[in-house]
Amino acid sequence: MNMKSYLKILLVTLILASCGQKEQEPFWLGADLGWITQYEAWGHKFYTKDGQEMECTALMKELGLNAVRHRVWVDPSKYGNWCSKEDLLVKCQRAKALDMEILLDFHYSDWWADPAKQNIPASWSGHSYEQMKQDLWNHTVEVLNYLKDNGITPKWIQVGNETRNGFLWSVKSNKFGWPELDENGNTTITESMGHVDRNPEQYAGFFATGYEACKSVFPKSIVMVHLDNGFDKDLYDYNLGVLKDNGAKWDMIGMSLYPFWALDGGFRTDEDQVITDCIENIKYVSKKFGCDVMIVETGFLVDESDPARMERSRSQLARTIRESINNTNGVCKGVFYWEPECRPSQYKLGAFTEDGRPTVIMDAFKDWSE
């Protein structure tokens, strides 16, 4: 073989090799923006730091983010229809137009679902376990097909939101939907259908049904289990062990990480240690369960009257991003801030001012090196 022929073969080989290489994904920096359409309906506006008005999703991209997270409720008609599938589509279309990836968060409730409450949708109440699995399947497929028919493909899909105690179980609630507390400050479970402690097999069965429903519409989307308290190794051992032992599977683990709430709830006494423990837990659960991890919710205290506290919050977010990238052996794929755009008077762990401008906390998304 002459040199000319050899060089041609070498060139073709190199071209084919380069074509076969999978493009490395970026580290995902995201925000949960579920409130934005509701804020807009209230007349609230968003601005760059220098006062230029900008739509919130576009502003997030300007601030260095490349992904969004949006929740969906089953029948939120009693709650203004926010986070219905129609409202969800509006928000997802904005993200798609900006080439931002989408994380879809199924709450499987008519309103908020979290560790304290996972109330069964009103239209599913009283159904048997098998009927409720069909309800879950139908709702999941309906929402996903609605998105698909409108050109939206979520990169990630959560089956449940912060399912520390399982999902599709109900507590006694007041007329506004909030749990009623007894004299000892505890909630009263009125229906334990998918509770992890009381009906572990059914919790796993619901999750497995949700997983398969997601894959039936979007087989390439990454389906996620999401728990709170990312620093709590024992929680993840127990809950994910229940799912695995009862035949459920997932593609990725999602974590919530809130150092402020960890202290406020008495789980820890040092905010920085909460972050340290979460990073260690990311590596632990990834190795034990054989999958990647993302921090799908985080947030840090906003107090503009205290510049030192604001800088500390910025530094904590920067550290969370930095260590997720550099200190998890590549298994942590992203960090999402929960509702950074919200007003501090409404929620104190956002990252914007009362008049809709990003605070110094948001600087961490572009400069997380220190």
Regions found by a protein language model. Name each.
Residues 41, 45, 112, 174-185, ...:
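Aromatic-rich peripheral "rim/lid" segments of glycoside hydrolase catalytic domains that contact
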Residues 39-40, 44-51, 74-86, 164-167, ...:
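Acidic-and-aromatic substrate-binding clefts and catalytic sites of carbohydrate-active enzymes
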Residues 4-12:
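Sec-dependent signal peptide recognition
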Residues 23-56:
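Boundary/entry segment of secreted carbohydrate-active catalytic domains
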Residues 17-18:
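C-terminal motif of bacterial Sec signal peptides marking the signal peptidase cleavage site
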Residues 56-57, 216-226, 230-306, 326, ...:
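Glycoside hydrolase catalytic-domain groove-lining segments
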Residues 43-61, 136-146, 232-243, 317-321:
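Short, acidic/polar
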Residues 59-199, 203-222, 228:
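Substrate-binding cleft and catalytic face of glycoside hydrolase catalytic domains
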